[in-house]
């Protein structure tokens, strides 16, 4: 059942008024593949635009807070925690893991996915002058806790 459609098939924001406030958490990831020398520049702090990981982390946090401005039917949420972690993966990729939490009436999956996506886009933006062939991939939900639909964890 598509929850964002009314009985006439029109898009609407889901009414969560009667839903109980519960603790909710979601974790998402994204990867940015790049040339090994691009990753080396980032890791060694030699990028001319500054600390790529720090800027991407802040962008991801800000994006999570702005999700309802970007995704039309998302509820504006009072997030209680947003964490964005970036790490080198092998010799040619950055892995981004975003985790969002709140006590509320609706989940935070879109906020976690948005945080990971925008952090990846920020890496691309900062590094495109040296590596136009970067690929953003594997944007996905890793885990969701809380709410009526219960626990979800991606298969390893």
Curated annotation (Swiss-Prot):
Its EC number is 4.6.1.17. One of its GO terms (biological process) is Mo-molybdopterin cofactor biosynthetic process. The active site is at residue 125. Pfam families: MoaC. It is an enzyme of class 4 (lyase). Keywords: Lyase, Molybdenum cofactor biosynthesis. This is Cyclic pyranopterin monophosphate synthase. Belongs to the MoaC family. Coiled coil: none annotated. It comes from Pseudomonas putida (strain W619). PANTHER family: CYCLIC PYRANOPTERIN MONOPHOSPHATE SYNTHASE, MOLYBDOPTERIN COFACTOR SYNTHESIS PROTEIN A. InterPro entries: MoaC (IPR023045), MoaC_bact/euk (IPR047594), MoaC_sf (IPR036522), MoCo_biosynth_MoaA/MoaC (IPR050105), Mopterin_CF_biosynth-C_dom (IPR002820). Substrate binds at residues 73-75, 110-111. Pathway: Cofactor biosynthesis; molybdopterin biosynthesis. GO terms for molecular function: cyclic pyranopterin monophosphate synthase activity. Homohexamer; trimer of dimers. It catalyses: (8S)-3',8-cyclo-7,8-dihydroguanosine 5'-triphosphate = cyclic pyranopterin phosphate + diphosphate. It comes from the Bacteria. Catalyzes the conversion of (8S)-3',8-cyclo-7,8-dihydroguanosine 5'-triphosphate to cyclic pyranopterin monophosphate (cPMP).
């Amino acid at each position: 059942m598509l929850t964002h459609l009314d009985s006439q098939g029109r898009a609407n924001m889901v009414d969560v008024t009667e839903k109980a406030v519960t603790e909710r958490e979601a974790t998402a990831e994204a990867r940015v593949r790049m040339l090994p020398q691009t990753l080396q520049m980032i890791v060694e702090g030699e990028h001319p635009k500054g600390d790529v990981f720090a800027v991407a982390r802040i962008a991801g946090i800000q994006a999570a807070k702005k999700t309802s401005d970007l995704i039309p039917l998302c509820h504006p949420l009072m997030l209680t925690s947003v964490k964005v972690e970036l790490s080198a993966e092998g010799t040619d990729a950055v892995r981004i893991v975003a985790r969002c939490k709140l006590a509320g009436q609706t989940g935070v999956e879109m906020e976690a996915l948005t945080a990971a996506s925008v952090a990846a886009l920020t890496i691309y933006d900062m590094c495109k002058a040296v590596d136009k062939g970067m690929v953003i991939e594997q944007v996905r939900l890793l885990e969701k806790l809380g709410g009526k639909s219960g626990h979800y964890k991606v298969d390893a």
